[in-house]
Amino acid sequence: MKVNLQTEFKQTQIQQVLDDLDRELIGLQAVKTRIREIAALLLVDRLRQKLGLSSSNPGLHMSFTGSPGTGKTTVATKMADILYRLGYIKKGHLITVTRDDLVGQYIGHTAPKTKQVLKNAMGGVLFIDEAYYLYRPDNERDYGAEAIEILLQVMENQRDDLVIIFAGYKEKMDRFYASNPGLSSRVANHVNFPDYTPEELLMIGKIMLQEQQYQFTPEAEEVFLQYIQRRMQQPHFANARSVRNALDRARLRQANRIFATPGQNLTKYDLVTIQAEDILKCRLFQ
């Protein structure tokens, strides 16, 4: 008996998901390569099953590390789709949660909360953002450890029904795993999301504007790149998320600039164009 790799690959339609990932995310080549590697492993494992070869279910739980706004949630959504198309999960949906969704504030509250989240996520992927906040060793009365114990049981006993992705800053996630070796041993796939370069963030910003039918003037584009370079040096920078916030404020200033001269006849160009002054009025340039 033989199986045709190309036929199997086409039937799963995972190439469409990988193409979407390439198109929707600027840069992140190492991340995209890692996702392709995981997809290849899962496809080959599926072929082994078809030929009756021994196939221990590959560890599917994952760790996504990196700063906010680097595409972790987007990639998690695509990963859920890949797992679904390959038959590793039954539904393919993604549930995103944080500590507050899992941990209660009093005795007996955490277990029901965590179990309800897990019930909702069954058949799909559970994405736990800033997972390290589940563990607070400095507080003996914290109930996060109870949530972790329940997660460990499900990761081991129901791994055919649910994939869990733990996400957050790399340094904090490393400490989280070091403090929870039982958890670390169950997470087979680690994917690191690097910060974007200023040029990549400019490209992301231009795409965001195009999606909303806006555009930069050439001067505004240069100024926005300068803005990004300055903003990256400031606290709480969140990559693409910070770019989106900056563009929202630029649109607000553009609207106020137009509104300040009510007598003029406006063209489509006037309404879609972000000028350099719409960016230069932000605090970073003052």
Swiss-Prot record:
SMART domains: AAA. It comes from the Eukaryota. The keyword Magnesium does not apply. Signal peptide: none annotated. Its main location: plastid. InterPro entries: AAA+_ATPase, AAA_lid_6, ATPase_AAA_core, CbxX/CfqX_mono, CbxX/CfxQ, CbxX/CfxQ_RuBisCO_ESX, P-loop_NTPase. GO terms for molecular function: ATP binding; ATP hydrolysis activity. Keywords: ATP-binding, Chloroplast, Nucleotide-binding, Plastid. One of its GO terms (cellular component) is chloroplast. It is found in: Plastid, Chloroplast. Belongs to the CbxX/CfxQ family. Necessary for the expression of RuBisCO. This is Protein CfxQ homolog. It comes from Cyanidium caldarium. The gene is cfxQ.
